[in-house]
Amino acid sequence: MSKVRIYTLAKDLGVDNHKMLEILDGLGVSYKSVSSTIDEENVEIIKQILADEAAEGGDAAPAAASAPAAATAEPEEADETPAAAAQADAEPASDLPHRAPVVTIMGHVDHGKTSLLDYIRKTRVAAKEAGGITQHVGAFEAKTSKGKIVFIDTPGHEAFTTIRARGANVADIAIIVIAADDSLMPQTREAIAHAQAAKVPMLIAINKVDLPQADPEKVKTDLTQLNLVPEEYGGDVIVVPVSAKTGEGVEDLLEYISLTAELEDLRADPKGQFSGVIIEGRVDKQAGVLATVMVQEGTLHVGDFLVVGENYGKIKAMTDSNGGRIKEAGPSTPVQILGFSEVPSSGETVVSAKNEHAAREIVAQRASDRRDEEDARERRKAQRSLADLLGPLGEVHTVNLILRADTQGSLEAIQGILARKETEDVKLNVMLAGIGAPTEGDVLLASTAEAQILCFNVTPSAAVTKVAETKEIPIKAYRIIYEMIDEVDRLIKGNLDPVFEEQYLGRAEVRMVIHHPKSGNIAGSYVTDGMFKRNAKAKVTRGKEVVYEGTVVGLKRFKDDVREVQQGYECGINIDWNDVQEGDIIEASEMVEVEPR
């Protein structure tokens, strides 16, 4: 009995993939994705359902009760219903028009990423446009039967993660290219880890299948070691054999990209407020500052004012992926912009302003907000309640690790020990484990995923150390394996729910109340015991009754603001409470972390 893939049947019958999955859900047919196969019996049932709907003028998916008992999936397919999940996540934005998917291609340096992009360019971009595309905006648009696909041509996964580290999600789909004659290499594992950290759908392209020594089955088997199980093995990872040299499988890859985009239901409002992301910025000797922007929402026009971080500019000229001048650009369109005075950083968000005055106001407000945040950060830390410090009870903490070692044996030994170190409260997640010194990509991944980099018998280069210092990512290197394990023990201990105790600081007697026009009533006090600190907890006692509990928001000695006042000195105490009275006793305390008992 022959079988047919779901997406192929949907295409042949002229319905979209979501509709096809709804019908299968109604029939009770199990599948893993739109590339799963169904048998002839179910194909005939689906055709009849669609014919009946066409005759009735309806489009509802059949109820499960109407499904024949024999309607079952192939045994290798798993019990999941993506259509139902997609419906549950549906947003009102479903009325918005679809946009093109934005795809990034990553993988090991010699596995053919550039060759694959070049082949797609050659066959999917008009000949007059293909030359010199990369020198314009680092991206290009490929035309397919399902619409356009935008490919970002960035130099490796490090650039991808730099954008992610700033909180931007510029890519919708990641293609991991793996050579059929080489299988998984260190950079392949890194690329997969970066894509997983970004939480974007992944497609695996096994390249160079035209070579005599190609072994795509080995690649698929090796992928399972990373918990990436191909569909033909019963998993949910789409694996496409391709050849960037002959073009074999490239059409299938483009089809799978379109199918993934359809299931992701990518939409944007071209009439809405503009927003975008900086892909890269550079200085051209002749033109000046150029910025590549991916339009995500709204439409960009020449003459618009844009704000990036604490800088703004007016679009003087705009270039599309072909190097041609354009006047406007909608969602999922990469453009190169001339108009900024300073080079923006990759991953920064871009918003529009009505005019220059509005742009200046946005920049001024952002600068003010940044200063306020810096000023308030210490105070917020000091004023956290005990509940804030403890966090949710029973929460399982995850420690993300990036491991580097000198040999595979060392790496396996370390991972074996780590597997025995996990507790009910703390989970150790090894995001990446590789042989050799840590790379800049490791640092960027650690920055994005809040991971720790631990090295055994290898040390980072000066360049990597400099990047790590800039990103404030510590790289810890060890020569003795148990010193590394001791560090892991410290990390586990540091991720356990902390234990805090309230410790007494001091006591003061209110001798006069001073009214301040801005700060309200200040307690003119004498510290009779211990000391007082700014931001300490304060408890006011009147007689034997506690009348107020709050925070010491300010301390003064004469006219000077001070951080603390010792026993035997007078001071002004501001507890942000106007009902303080002479004779009140103010007691100060602070929350101090103690060793778990």
From Swiss-Prot:
InterPro entries: EF-G-like_DII, IF2_II, IF2_N, P-loop_NTPase, Small_GTP-bd, T_Tr_GTP-bd_dom, TF_IF2_bacterial-like, TIF_IF2. Residues 132-136 are annotated as: G2. Residues 57-96 are annotated as: Disordered. Residues 207-210 are annotated as: G4. Residues 107-114 are annotated as: G1. One of its GO terms (cellular component) is cytoplasm. Its main location: cytoplasm. It comes from the Bacteria. The keyword Calcium does not apply. GO terms for molecular function: GTP binding; GTPase activity; translation initiation factor activity. Residues 243-245 are annotated as: G5. Keywords: Cytoplasm, GTP-binding, Initiation factor, Nucleotide-binding, Protein biosynthesis. PROSITE patterns: G_TR_2, IF2. Pfam families: EF-G_D2, GTP_EFTU, IF-2, IF2_N. GO terms for biological process: translational initiation. GTP binds at residues 107-114, 153-157, 207-210. Belongs to the TRAFAC class translation factor GTPase superfamily. Classic translation factor GTPase family. IF-2 subfamily. One of the essential components for the initiation of protein synthesis. Protects formylmethionyl-tRNA from spontaneous hydrolysis and promotes its binding to the 30S ribosomal subunits. Also involved in the hydrolysis of GTP during the formation of the 70S ribosomal complex. This is Translation initiation factor IF-2. It comes from Deinococcus radiodurans (strain ATCC 13939 / DSM 20539 / JCM 16871 / CCUG 27074 / LMG 4051 / NBRC 15346 / NCIMB 9279 / VKM B-1422 / R1). The lineage of its organism: Bacteria, Thermotogati, Deinococcota, Deinococci, Deinococcales.
